[in-house]
């Protein structure tokens, strides 16, 4: 499950070297490059040495998924997920938790992996950053596709080592976005033309919940589509329907900008100049495209 490509193996060795030299490490890797895979050798070495290891992740669902993957990889160790609904057991060999759950641990971890540090709730949150530092007595490994200026400054000053990986395991080039400058009414006309020709599943990103809901209703008489926002109750069911091709399109917000892989998916961003779509958000959105070996390219 965690077999590495040559590029991943090279990056993984660099991480191990920097950690052993006493540095915190920033892994700057493209969406879909396999950041979890890059952590396996550092995790293995730390766990084999009897050290306490933690992985902090922004979203509860990903905590549960990563905990399962880690338990399969480290069968003889106790891997404990700590998040909403899973707080009765908080101690083990490897702790996988949401960012906020780090408050439970004081100077506990010899190695702490911080995933998606460019995302809510960690991004720009000085309190969570302090909680994370307090939980770790050793080294911190930061994972992101969009490092902020603060981290890059630490790299330039030599206080943080950076390892880069911009190739996905399938070896194909990253998908580059196509940009069209149109007034909003013409954006909808252009979208309609795209939808009529579209043969693959598509995520259509809009800046607000209201627009997602309105466009979902507007286009539903013409296409198999739905809206998915933070207010949607049956999120997993809607995503499953898109994967099964029971739906062709989902109108959504930045809630689906990360943490979701749909083979063959294309993306469109309407009103991409809206403030909600910052650089990091747009990079994550285009990062949904071309992730699988069977469909390494696409439209975004």
Predicted regions and their residues:
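Walker A/P-loop
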Residues: 20-42
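Conserved strand-helix element at the start of the C-terminal RecA-like helicase core
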Residues: 29-36, 46, 51-66, 194-219
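Conserved RecA-like helicase motor core of SF1/SF2 enzymes
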Residues: 116-119, 243-248, 254-296
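Conserved helicase ATPase core of P-loop NTP-dependent helicases/translocases
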Residues: 80-89, 226-253
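Conserved nucleic-acid-binding Ia/Ib motif block in the N-terminal RecA-like helicase ATPase lobe
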Residues: 48-52, 57-99, 225
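Post-DEXD/H (motif II) to motif III coupling segment of the RecA-like Helicase ATP-binding lobe
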Residues: 107-111, 116-181, 185-186, 190
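Conserved segment of the helicase C-terminal RecA-like domain
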Residues: 137-150, 286-300
